[in-house]
């Protein structure tokens, strides 16, 4: 049996993540963990560093992001390079919908088999109607099945029933917010400070408002550590259900290809320029014209003149700074 941490938040998840990419890589090397995900909330800023570090340390990197869809938290994992590009588009659309609190609607999501979606159940259980609509868009959808303490008993029973009713497979997860088992207290302090709460205030886990985790088990676990945890703490989950959730965890890892990104100056990916365009600038200008035809072409001439001036100035700035 192999277990992989499929939901991992780094310090790029400013409000909730505490572990750094370097710390996670270090733990993987110490514990012999061969696969690692990065699924920050509303952020893919750490992806390039993550891929580089994983490749240098012979770790299979799984690229992901956690987004809100119809008020449900969902972790998306890229199965391939096309899935990576789809995740970038979904993240962009979510910020277009609301910059302060990004979200997606099911209509924002196109039908795809390039990504895996893990619907969170730890904080809020999805409705059957939502699952039905969402599964019409994404081929590979799983329900999060976590064994962590807190209200696990009620959650596991309810999620199991939901899985059976909707024919949605369960996948075992260990939501990871920090790298080391000794970092729980610092993680709690970090979450409280960012949201301007005192540690003396009642946490959400006890009906209060202070952000907090349900338990001190949210660190990066090896397969053996998970096995030990299950043996010592989990007696209320049928073995058949638990074993299948573990099998599904490995099945997800197996279906995911290693995403490879080429770099320029060690910083950014090389864009794909479709024919007949010769370079990124000509392609970019064509995209601008496409947007112009959709948005500006029917507007009054004085508006068009103002837009042309603005586009010209911004294009000069973009090009002079070598952004394309």
Language-model-derived ranges and their functions:
Residues 1-324:
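Phosphodiester-processing cores and adjacent nucleic acid-binding clamps
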């Amino acid at each position: 049996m192999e277990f992989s941490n499929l939901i991992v938040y780094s310090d790029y998840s400013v409000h909730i993540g505490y572990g750094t990419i370097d710390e996670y890589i270090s733990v993987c090397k110490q514990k012999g963990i061969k696969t690692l995900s990065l699924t920050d909330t509303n952020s893919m800023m750490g992806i390039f560093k993550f891929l580089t570090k994983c490749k240098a340390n012979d770790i299979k990197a799984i690229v992901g992001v956690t987004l809100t869809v119809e008020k449900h938290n969902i972790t998306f994992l890229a199965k391939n390079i096309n899935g990576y590009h789809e995740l970038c588009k979904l993240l962009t659309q979510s910020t277009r919908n609301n910059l302060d609190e990004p979200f997606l609607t099911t209509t924002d999501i196109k039908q795809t088999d390039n990504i895996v979606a893990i619907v969170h159940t730890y904080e809020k259980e999805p409705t059957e109607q939502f699952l039905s609509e969402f599964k019409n868009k994404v081929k590979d959808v799983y329900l999060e099945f976590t064994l962590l303490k807190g209200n696990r008993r009620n959650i596991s029973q309810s999620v199991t029933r939901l899985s059976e009713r909707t024919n949605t497979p369960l996948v075992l997860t260990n939501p990871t917010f920090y790298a080391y088992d000794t970092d729980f207290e610092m993680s709690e302090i970090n979450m409280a400070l960012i949201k301007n709460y005192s540690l003396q205030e009642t946490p959400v886990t006890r009906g209060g408002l202070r952000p907090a985790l349900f338990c001190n088990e949210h660190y990066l676990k090896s397969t053996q550590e998970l096995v030990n945890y299950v043996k010592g703490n989990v007696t209320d989950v049928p073995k058949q259900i638990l074993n299948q959730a573990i099998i599904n965890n490995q099945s997800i890892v197996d279906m995911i290809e290693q995403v490879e990104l080429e770099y320029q100056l060690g910083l950014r990916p090389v864009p794909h320029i479709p024919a007949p365009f010769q370079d990124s600038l000509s392609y970019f200008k064509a995209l601008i014209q496409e947007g112009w035809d959709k948005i500006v072409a029917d507007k009054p001439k004085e508006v068009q003149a103002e837009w042309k001036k603005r586009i010209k100035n911004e294009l000069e700035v973009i090009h002079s700074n070598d952004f394309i």
